[in-house]
Amino acid sequence: MAEFLKFNLGQKFCAVSHLACGRAKFLPLLLGACLAAGAAEGGHDGSGLTECGGLTAGFDQTERGGQLACFDQTTRCVSTACFDQTANRKKDVVMKKIIAKHIDATKMPAELSDIPARLDAEGVAYNAIGCNNWPEAFPYTPKVEVRVAHTGDAIVLHYRVEESTVQAEAEDNGKVWEDSCCEFFSIPAGDGVYYNIECNCAGQMLIGGGAERKNRERAAKEVLETVKRWSSLGREPFAEKAAPASWQMVMVIPASAFFKHHIGSFTGKTIRANFYKCGDRLKQQHYLSWNPIDLPRPNFHCPEFFGELTFE
């Protein structure tokens, strides 16, 4: 039976639950004084956190409207169940977390195709991009994973995909989201401006930046050329192949690719981010995310549902 620790927030009651390794399993949280201490601090976006028993309780008045979130350091999952008395409904807010391992740039292979082996040697774990948030409309769920590392001045992404059909017709700054596409959205500077870095299975990509979905600025060709890309399917465009395929992609994204900011180093930063897999024009259309999205229809431009990405 689920046991909740409730506290009154005026018009809302929030209940903290534990999401164990992706399984919707509620566990009792005997946080006691930790809850009071976290609430007293009233930190913004993870500040003012108090630890006890491997759990971290934080009271965030800004981003969650006065909700309590608990982060389990072992499973790296967060779940906050909120009951809005006014709307008389329950809303689950989940914030996952990835810790990106720092790898000395001198240890990174010159050949991008050798980077997966380097990440293996460094023990960098995969994270499932497996949340099918709209299963009724789009039931197909390919197997997709990503792992993240960094060199201080660049983010290293390695995607691994198994799907029933693949396509790569778009070119750089084209409609890559209509192909077999992996996407990385992030807020690198904490100012509300987020970037969408989208890349199809042939390494053709686009980068957009802005504070909202409309009127986004596209990165110039010169910026795209700074992002190193490797795909196990090659770099040439191809029409849809309706046959099961397994493919991998590596992206090395320099800080300069975040063209609306001047980011010196990622080391020690914690940012908000989400990872996606889509294929708008594929026979098996799908929309998957790493961190869950609670919206009625597919929409990846939703920073309120980003998880956390911390760079060692």
Question: Which residues does each predicted region cover?
Answer:
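Tyrosine-centered aromatic motifs in long, intrinsically disordered, low-complexity repeat arrays
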Residues: 4-7, 58-59, 64-65, 70-71, ...
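Structural preference for beta-rich elements and adjacent junctions enriched in aromatics
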Residues: 94-312
